[in-house]
Amino acid sequence: MYEIKLKNLTKSFGSLNAVDDITFTIPKSSVTVLLGPSGCGKTTLMRMIAGLETPTTGSIFFDDTEVTRVPTKRRNLGMVFQYPVIYRGTSVRRNLELPLLTEKLPSEEINKRVNDVAELLGISGDLNKMVEELDNGTRQKIAVGRAVARQPQIILFDEPITNIDITAKLELKRSLKEVFSRLSQTIIYVTHDQTEAMTLADQIALMKDGVITQCAPPKEIYEKPKSQFAGWFLGNPGINFVEKEHIGQSGTGITSSLFTQSIEAGSKAVKVKALGVRAEAIEVKTKQVPDSQTAHVLRKSLGIGGQYLLDLEYGSLKVKARVPHQLGREIGKKVWTTIKSSDIILFDENGVAI
């Protein structure tokens, strides 16, 4: 399968650089998710890899072969779009067969591929049904099956589960996770949904304003965001930011009203703009203990899937904490917090992690 290498890739529309000088490698047989808000350039980047857009400058390589201006049909890739491409008035089996018939494969090979893909996607029982009988989630599985059955080197997914209902979305996400674990193709998946990215990716390329701000495995990019943007965009809720008005700095030591210990910034020259801490990293106690901070006021408690999301207030400082059980504390009463130094991330004046 192909390794994909992008070198100084730029796509301009007038004065706007939708993709701005990206150099980036996608390992072969990996699942790479291009994640970011609407308008960040992720779909434009995918379309250039597919050959549907021509770069303004820069190069694209599949392994060591440059394909920057090679037509899409010669790139040996499959695509699954937001709106499934299916043939109405035909059966599921026929929809899966058609791309293979154009390649003039033997009928035995076509039947084998169709049956294998249907089993992989859990739609074997639907093969003889007309596509009009199926829900949107199953129709999107057909679109996935059509791309997989061709056995291309690369498969591109452009927000494939955005326009289906929540139940079908969860089922399709589970199916895609299973499919991806069993495929050897290089997969590129575009989404604005962080939950999809965290569930499906081997690596996430987080995009903003046409550039990749961080590329790392999901766990790393969540626990060690390299920017305030990454900390805010990944997580529900996003990371708590304590801005400089709540931070004290003396030499390399950093203190805050959120915690008792002093954190080392590493250099006196570094000016700390903000610090970040995840909601689940804040331990909340109903009684004060020696290592806990001055009392916060509990303002809200919301049960979510067996956990509780708390809104805490310390003067003008407001943070969210996630705890595994109900506190048994009335709203408006005091609670105390503890945070490990290793869970605190410092950000400089440019919003970059120190």
Which sequence ranges carry the predicted segments?
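ABC ATPase nucleotide-binding domains
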Residues: 76, 82, 86-229
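The feature captures the beta-strand-to-loop junction immediately N-terminal to the Walker
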Residues: 35-37
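Helix-to-loop junction immediately C-terminal to a conserved catalytic motif
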Residues: 50
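Non-catalytic connector elements of ABC transporters
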Residues: 237, 249-354
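Conserved coupling/switch loops of ABC nucleotide-binding domains, chiefly the family-specific signature
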Residues: 56-59, 209
